[in-house]
Amino acid sequence: MPYLGSEDVVKELKKALCNPHIQADRLRYRNVIQRVIRYMTQGLDMSGVFMEMVKASATVDIVQKKLVYLYMCTYAPLKPDLALLAINTLCKDCSDPNPMVRGLALRSMCSLRMPGVQEYIQQPILNGLRDKASYVRRVAVLGCAKMHNLHGDSEVDGALVNELYSLLRDQDPIVVVNCLRSLEEILKQEGGVVINKPIAHHLLNRMSKLDQWGQAEVLNFLLRYQPRSEEELFDILNLLDSFLKSSSPGVVMGATKLFLILAKMFPHVQTDVLVRVKGPLLAACSSESRELCFVALCHVRQILHSLPGHFSSHYKKFFCSYSEPHYIKLQKVEVLCELVNDENVQQVLEELRGYCTDVSADFAQAAIFAIGGIARTYTDQCVQILTELLGLRQEHITTVVVQTFRDLVWLCPQCTEAVCQALPGCEENIQDSEGKQALIWLLGVHGERIPNAPYVLEDFVENVKSETFPAVKMELLTALLRLFLSRPAECQDMLGRLLYYCIEEEKDMAVRDRGLFYYRLLLVGIDEVKRILCSPKSDPTLGLLEDPAERPVNSWASDFNTLVPVYGKAHWATISKCQGAERCDPELPKTSSFAASGPLIPEENKERVQELPDSGALMLVPNRQLTADYFEKTWLSLKVAHQQVLPWRGEFHPDTLQMALQVVNIQTIAMSRAGSRPWKAYLSAQDDTGCLFLTELLLEPGNSEMQISVKQNEARTETLNSFISVLETVIGTIEEIKS
């Protein structure tokens, strides 16, 4: 290993670099320098040969110079006493007759990250902007942006900006593109580079001479120009027409976006453009590059929001291949759902049916949900397939089919009879809470059509004590009461037993309150129960299942060829906000927003909870409520990221802890009653980047320590440590209140 005996290695290399016989042999000399670079990249400190490496730069060998420049840029900040020697060497090479040497030296100078280096690189950069060699001008233009970054918050050099604007007329196309990039960086605080009519027309005329990367860049900058007349607009569109046929997907997408933005007043032109890019998009969807394929599929879905069925004739292009990754398969299934019509429905359903038995449970469930979405239009065919899937008696398939049936009978009442005939016997293959809730809901609402409905619910009642999900218990209460109204003789006894358990023994307050509500409602009379439970009502989630209206192209044209179709508009806005602004300390809500009958937390302790230690990048989002089912599902799917114990003595009121947690935006999902043992609490919180923290607090009988278990949906050690710090502060504050 080179790390052992490193001093001997440095001495050996230093001796070799000073050997005149090696210096006389160019290949041997270069090989020694390559050894220095190799050891440097392996982590060995090679700063001891700095002087010898600077001397090695005095050569006509371009390869050797490049290696030495790499070394000097790496170690110059670590050797400030010798860095000036390196700068002088580079400045000298900036005047070398060879343009490759001049450009290489200038690029290396701009890469130095040292205080005060600006005064040394300014004049070489200005000279480079006027150099006859295009390669040197390319490097000098990019060096302007680097020099501006080194200056920090100093004022923008107007003369330098004017020089860069004049270089937009340069004969070298790469210099032009580099000028745009540098101006954008330098003028970032002023809104970026300004594209006026002369610049826009000049760039349009030079487009054919640019490489594909440059074309994509220029198309993005041209979005800032607004034509003055309709005639000018169509002249620009005619110039851009050929780029819709480019072999580069980036150029095609950039040209398409520019077309959509410029033609915002001409919907027929927008539609024609989207028809013309159908071929390139389909080719990208079949690309071997998985990243390109995924992004293309996201853009296809975006286009389908405005042009439903736009790709219907090419539906087979979206059939999934066995070797494709999971995320691409899910996108293709979503697209297939939107391409179904009378001509291809049978083929699409057969394809989706094959996916339902995929080895990936998540993909199989997504395919079943997709069939459920198609069932709103082609009900009979889809219900038949879903019924056949129930016969497979596989837990993950049965669970999703029952959930799909629940949504289907709600939206398509005509299929209720077929669904009710398919349900008997499926309860044996349902174990998770979502499937149980869906089945119980169906038995409660349509139990009069299902012969064994009371007996299935009776099994749930008998096992209610071992049921761990409060949402299942609440659904069971409602379903059994509904079924009691239509089949009272079979349900009266078990309803009484369930109400007794929920009121007298259940520890979850939400379940207990619902049991009390139904008990008191029954005391009022059956007519009142029917009026409340069986009255016509609309569910708030109905809007999620209805067909979304077609969106005009202009509503998403500005998001085309960006990451918005990939992340979603809201999520991307959050990411952009975090990238654009430095993280600030979390701003906690004021305690006055939480109403309480009495001071659960003394004012001095409230101030302590609010004045938490700096949590770095952590900023918990207020009012982030999770359902118990979602919490449970996520909790079971994640591994414990952190565990610890905190000292704990005596009793406390749970409301005190809940109040303190709310102050710091940590929500309580469920909590045991005061004094119960073991005592548990489940908490959730989410930061502004979407990282979710799920927490379990546990107090065992006779134990003087509180056990804390935290799970995280994204592995971020820094934010996890910040969250633990906040949690420790809250619990420590409550401990002081008790004492």
From Swiss-Prot:
<dbReference type="InterPro" id="IPR012295">
    <property type="entry name" value="TBP_dom_sf"/>
</dbReference>
<dbReference type="GO" id="GO:0006886">
    <property type="term" value="P:intracellular protein transport"/>
</dbReference>
<keyword id="KW-0523">Neurodegeneration</keyword>
<dbReference type="GO" id="GO:0016192">
    <property type="term" value="P:vesicle-mediated transport"/>
</dbReference>
<dbReference type="GO" id="GO:0032588">
    <property type="term" value="C:trans-Golgi network membrane"/>
</dbReference>
<keyword id="KW-0813">Transport</keyword>
<dbReference type="GO" id="GO:0005829">
    <property type="term" value="C:cytosol"/>
</dbReference>
<keyword id="KW-0653">Protein transport</keyword>
<comment type="similarity">
    <text>Belongs to the adaptor complexes large subunit family.</text>
</comment>
<dbReference type="GO" id="GO:0006605">
    <property type="term" value="P:protein targeting"/>
</dbReference>
<dbReference type="GO" id="GO:0030124">
    <property type="term" value="C:AP-4 adaptor complex"/>
</dbReference>
<dbReference type="InterPro" id="IPR002553">
    <property type="entry name" value="Clathrin/coatomer_adapt-like_N"/>
</dbReference>
<dbReference type="GO" id="GO:0061938">
    <property type="term" value="P:protein localization to somatodendritic compartment"/>
</dbReference>
<dbReference type="GO" id="GO:0005802">
    <property type="term" value="C:trans-Golgi network"/>
</dbReference>
<keyword id="KW-0890">Hereditary spastic paraplegia</keyword>
<dbReference type="InterPro" id="IPR015151">
    <property type="entry name" value="B-adaptin_app_sub_C"/>
</dbReference>
<dbReference type="Pfam" id="PF01602">
    <property type="entry name" value="Adaptin_N"/>
</dbReference>
<dbReference type="InterPro" id="IPR011989">
    <property type="entry name" value="ARM-like"/>
</dbReference>
<dbReference type="GO" id="GO:0030131">
    <property type="term" value="C:clathrin adaptor complex"/>
</dbReference>
<feature type="region of interest" description="Hinge">
    <location>
        <begin position="534"/>
        <end position="600"/>
    </location>
</feature>
<protein>
    <recommendedName>
        <fullName>AP-4 complex subunit beta-1</fullName>
    </recommendedName>
</protein>
<dbReference type="GO" id="GO:0031904">
    <property type="term" value="C:endosome lumen"/>
</dbReference>
<keyword id="KW-0472">Membrane</keyword>
<dbReference type="GO" id="GO:0030276">
    <property type="term" value="F:clathrin binding"/>
</dbReference>
<dbReference type="InterPro" id="IPR016024">
    <property type="entry name" value="ARM-type_fold"/>
</dbReference>
<comment type="function">
    <text>Component of the adaptor protein complex 4 (AP-4). Adaptor protein complexes are vesicle coat components involved both in vesicle formation and cargo selection. They control the vesicular transport of proteins in different trafficking pathways. AP-4 forms a non clathrin-associated coat on vesicles departing the trans-Golgi network (TGN) and may be involved in the targeting of proteins from the trans-Golgi network (TGN) to the endosomal-lysosomal system.</text>
</comment>
<dbReference type="GO" id="GO:0008104">
    <property type="term" value="P:protein localization"/>
</dbReference>
<dbReference type="Pfam" id="PF09066">
    <property type="entry name" value="B2-adapt-app_C"/>
</dbReference>
<keyword id="KW-0333">Golgi apparatus</keyword>
<comment type="subunit">
    <text>Adaptor protein complex 4 (AP-4) is a heterotetramer composed of two large adaptins (epsilon-type subunit AP4E1 and beta-type subunit AP4B1), a medium adaptin (mu-type subunit AP4M1) and a small adaptin (sigma-type AP4S1). Interacts with TEPSIN; this interaction requires the presence of a functional AP-4 complex. Interacts with GRIA2; probably indirect it mediates the somatodendritic localization of GRIA2 in neurons.</text>
</comment>
<feature type="region of interest" description="Ear; mediates interaction with TEPSIN">
    <location>
        <begin position="601"/>
        <end position="739"/>
    </location>
</feature>
<dbReference type="GO" id="GO:0098541">
    <property type="term" value="C:cytoplasmic side of trans-Golgi network transport vesicle membrane"/>
</dbReference>
<dbReference type="InterPro" id="IPR026739">
    <property type="entry name" value="AP_beta"/>
</dbReference>
<dbReference type="InterPro" id="IPR016342">
    <property type="entry name" value="AP_complex_bsu_1_2_4"/>
</dbReference>
